């Protein structure tokens, strides 16, 4: 959600390291969350659905001294999981090669670990730095089974496997400034910047052919360039004791960063995020009526996505709804959120593959775009460790 300008001693904000400076002395903030996705995907003439569950993030924030906080975050960055099987329909290939079946399988994930400091050098201003470590392993397999229709009867199979290991460090810098701050309300502007990072994964690729005997055709060990874009975010936050409003804008410079994929009609464009949200707590101090101490949240987000496929933009937009449930009379709480969103579209057509992308022979390929409608449920446990956590027990 939104939060580049948000700062609160009761909640850790992993979007901006400058917010770590707001942690109270002799307190600890700990968050852990998970999310479940229910996705309905369809093309112009087919549809499917699937469910996924992931640990979303683990956060911890502790004070080092007054105005200086240390934060740690572990967040999934990407997750790969697919299995696709296709049958060749090109009559020219069927006549000259035979029946061909393609199968693609991918699995793995990457995770980012952030270690950061937030410092409040003077009143109404905070500055922070996060060091990020990216780590993960992704495996992609493909099989091509050829059944000749003339002369030969033995199937020929081509196996390919690519394993990518990611291990790289990056940095995020952030700042927050209170344009207005008193006992009744606070109005804050926040900014973050992440320079681009070349992940340069270690790639091992092998290709094996099998017919009457097995033959290893190619084995390669190399590194290739893959960049995460530079990112700039700016946000506004207006908060009172009962009400809060957040607005964020993020720009990611993908255009011209990584090589396009003309074989599959993929190009890259700059990414724009807009996120907005409001929160209302009827009466935070009401010890008798539980529902008056609950948090009620409503939000919206829009993302034009960085991939352009076959000339089509893939927009992602969602409405979010959330509730915060206080735990007893303390400052810890359980947060539950619901997202209702849509990504992509159901366009179809024919894509012309240039000769430079298909081995010297221009060709055309039919395609169908996929539209996803998704429902996400997220659950987060937010624990606030108060002064007594730091008291040394005494026994008589």
For each predicted feature, which ranges?
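N-terminal, post-signal peptide beta-strand-biased segments of exported outer-membrane/organellar beta-barrel
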Residues: 1-75, 341
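Outer-membrane beta-barrel porins/channels
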Residues: 63-396
């Amino acid at each position: 959600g939104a939060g580049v300008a948000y700062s609160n001693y009761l909640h850790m904000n992993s979007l901006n390291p400058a917010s770590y400076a707001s942690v109270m002395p002799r307190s600890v903030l700990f968050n852990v969350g998970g999310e479940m996705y229910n996705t309905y995907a369809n093309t112009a003439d087919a549809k499917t659905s699937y469910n996924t569950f992931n640990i979303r993030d683990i956060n911890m924030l502790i004070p080092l001294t007054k105005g200086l906080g240390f934060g740690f975050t572990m967040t999934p960055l990407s997750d790969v999981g697919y299995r696709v099987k296709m049958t060749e329909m090109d009559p020219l290939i069927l006549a000259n090669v035979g029946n061909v079946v393609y199968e693609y399988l991918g699995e793995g994930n990457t995770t980012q670990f952030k270690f950061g400091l937030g410092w409040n050098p003077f009143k109404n201003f905070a500055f922070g730095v996060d060091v990020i470590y990216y780590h993960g392993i992704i495996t992609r397999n493909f099989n091509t089974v050829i059944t000749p229709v003339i002369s030969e009867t033995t199937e020929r199979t081509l196996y390919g496997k690519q394993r990518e290991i990611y291990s790289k460090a990056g940095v995020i810098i952030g700042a927050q400034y209170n344009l207005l701050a008193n006992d009744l309300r606070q109005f804050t502007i926040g900014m973050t910047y992440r320079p681009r990072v070349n992940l340069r994964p270690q790639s091992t690729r092998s290709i094996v052919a099998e017919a009457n005997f097995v033959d290893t055709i190619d084995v390669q060990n190399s590194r290739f360039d893959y960049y995460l874009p530079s990112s700039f975010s700016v946000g506004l936050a207006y908060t009172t004791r009962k009400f809060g409003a957040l607005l964020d804008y993020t720009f990611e410079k993908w255009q011209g960063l990584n090589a396009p994929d003309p074989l599959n009609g993929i190009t890259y464009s700059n990414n724009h995020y807009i996120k907005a949200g409001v929160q209302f707590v009827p009466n935070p101090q009401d010890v008798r009526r539980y529902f008056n101490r609950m948090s009620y949240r409503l939000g919206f987000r829009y993302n034009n996505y960085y991939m352009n496929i076959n000339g089509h933009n893939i927009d992602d937009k969602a409405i979010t709804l959330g509730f915060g449930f206080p735990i007893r009379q303390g400052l810890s709480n359980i947060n539950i959120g619901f997202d209702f969103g849509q990504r992509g579209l159901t366009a179809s057509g024919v894509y012309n593959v240039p000769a430079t992308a298909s081995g010297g022979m221009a060709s055309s390929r039919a395609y169908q775009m996929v539209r996803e409608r998704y429902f996400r449920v997220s659950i987060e446990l937010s624990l606030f460790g108060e002064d007594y956590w730091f008291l040394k027990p005494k026994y008589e």
